[in-house]
């Protein structure tokens, strides 16, 4: 925070047999020097009707705390939600443009399962990264598993909103040349193997 204090946010899970599931978000102060949690853990946000409130993170901007959460699970109901408050103690107000992002109502969108966003900005230009997947057929298998994409956002009446005015992500987004700095190096290679042999171990990975 502005005063140098740190906080740890986490999803709360309800293990009771009669009502198992996600139960909102908790916050606790983190002592950076001692590298441990201190003080009382507080349950401070219950989530939305989309359910499965997880992956919480907070941005402070213009005197507001913005709580960005993943919602709906990581399947085809995946979404991102935003709430804000003047204090970490609340009260928290859900965005009128809820959800910030989802494709649960847009099965033809190429970036399915979109949600779990993270804010970033370059000067006055604001963006969110997102988790998504590209199915081979409508709502079918996604052979590349989870992928990462970028969307441009605008601030409308103090709320973040996708720049296209909807909550549906776009496949192509224009950004300034200096916004994204490549960090990958060229690791291309040519591999030759016989059709009746096993794939090289470098071709194998866990399915996500």
Role assignments for model-derived ranges:
Residues 1-208:
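Carbohydrate-active catalytic/glycan-binding domains of CAZyme proteins
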């Amino acid at each position: 925070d502005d005063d140098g204090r740190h906080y740890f946010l986490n999803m709360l899970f309800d293990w009771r047999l009669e009502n198992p599931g996600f139960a909102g978000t908790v916050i606790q102060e983190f002592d950076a020097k001692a590298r441990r949690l201190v003080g009382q853990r507080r349950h401070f946000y219950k989530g939305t009707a989309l359910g499965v409130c997880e992956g919480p993170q907070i941005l402070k901007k213009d005197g507001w705390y913005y709580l960005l959460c993943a919602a709906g699970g990581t399947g085809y109901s995946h979404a991102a939600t935003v709430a804000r408050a003047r204090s970490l103690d609340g009260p928290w107000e859900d965005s009128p443009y809820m959800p910030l992002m989802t494709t649960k109502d847009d099965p033809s969108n190429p970036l399915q399962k979109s949600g779990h966003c993270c804010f970033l900005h370059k000067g006055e230009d604001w963006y969110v990264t997102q988790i998504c997947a590209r199915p081979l057929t409508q709502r079918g298998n996604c052979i590349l598993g989870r992928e990462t994409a970028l969307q441009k956002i605008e601030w409308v009446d103090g709320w973040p909103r996708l720049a296209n005015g909807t909550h549906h992500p776009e496949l192509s987004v224009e950004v300034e040349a200096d916004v994204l700095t490549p960090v990958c190096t060229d690791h291309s290679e040519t591999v030759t193997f016989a059709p009746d042999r096993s794939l090289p171990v470098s071709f194998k990975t866990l399915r996500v």
